């Protein structure tokens, strides 16, 4: 009896996910799958070997609605989280570096702006991030404490007209090519605050880490 039930399992879809999806979710999944197989897969080996990131990938993802896909409004498609998970799985199927590029842009850059930013900030950044015209990164992890937010050394000191931020971040995906930086720091009271920085601001640098062992295409 046990042998018969074992043989009846569909190993291509053991959790029967396919029959649980809606038509819209399948369409999103198939779109991401086609993009991954036709656009990303042919060049991933060379990108991995050379540690190169093709900036056009962001624009191609944006044109298909794959960036900031769960956000409603601001030129974003507003799909459900199941669809977002399916997108991530299809991009991850090709390379985790490409998935990292997409998920950092969507979940760690666009979502914080959408959830906590002012209306002016949302209108300024989200449409351009959704198309891939702008590239973003998420600056939490630091050399000394890793991703332990409670141990942040980076400080945001109140000054006339705003804040002066000092500190260092490490292992920040997308940072060497980013236009928008979501940076987390402790303020004068020791509370963690998020800041939006832009490429070219005085004192801001994002050198590329050479010789990575993984995520080399991102």
Description of each model-found segment:
Residues 1-24:
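Intrinsic disorder at enzyme termini
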Residues 25, 36, 87, 118, ...:
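Buried hydrophobic positions in well-ordered alpha/beta secondary-structure cores of metabolic enzymes
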Residues 63-132, 174-180:
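Internal helix-loop-helix
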Residues 132-140:
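A short, Trp-centered hydrophobic/proline-enriched beta-strand micro-motif
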Residues 147-148, 163:
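Hydrophobic, small-residue-rich alpha-helical packing segments that form membrane-like cores
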Residues 151, 200-218:
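Flexible, small-/acidic-enriched active-site or ligand-binding loops
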Residues 154-157:
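A structural signal for short hydrophobic beta-strand segments in well-ordered beta-sheet cores
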Residues 161-162, 166-207:
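A short core secondary-structure module
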């Amino acid at each position: 009896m046990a042998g018969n039930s074992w043989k009846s399992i569909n190993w291509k879809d053991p959790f029967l996910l396919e029959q649980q999806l809606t038509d819209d979710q399948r369409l999103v999944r198939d779109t991401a799958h086609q993009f991954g197989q036709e656009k990303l897969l042919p060049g991933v080996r060379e990108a991995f070997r050379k540690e190169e990131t093709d900036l056009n990938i962001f624009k191609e993802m944006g044109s298909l609605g794959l960036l900031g896909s769960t956000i409603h409004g601001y030129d974003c498609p507003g799909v459900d989280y199941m669809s977002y998970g399916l997108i991530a799985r299809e991009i991850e199927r090709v390379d985790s570096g490409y998935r990292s590029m997409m998920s950092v842009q969507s979940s760690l850059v666009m979502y914080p702006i959408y959830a906590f930013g002012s209306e002016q900030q949302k209108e300024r950044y989200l449409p351009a991030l959704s198309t891939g015209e702008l590239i973003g990164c998420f600056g939490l992890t630091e050399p000394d404490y890793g991703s332990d937010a409670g141990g942040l050394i980076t400080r945001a000191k109140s000054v006339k007209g705003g804040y002066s931020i000092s500190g260092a971040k490490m292992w920040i995906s997308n940072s060497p090519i980013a236009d928008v930086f979501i940076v987390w720091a402790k303020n004068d009271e020791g509370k963690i605050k998020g800041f939006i920085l832009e490429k070219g601001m005085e004192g801001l640098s994002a050198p590329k880490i050479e010789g990575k062992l993984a995520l080399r295409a991102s």
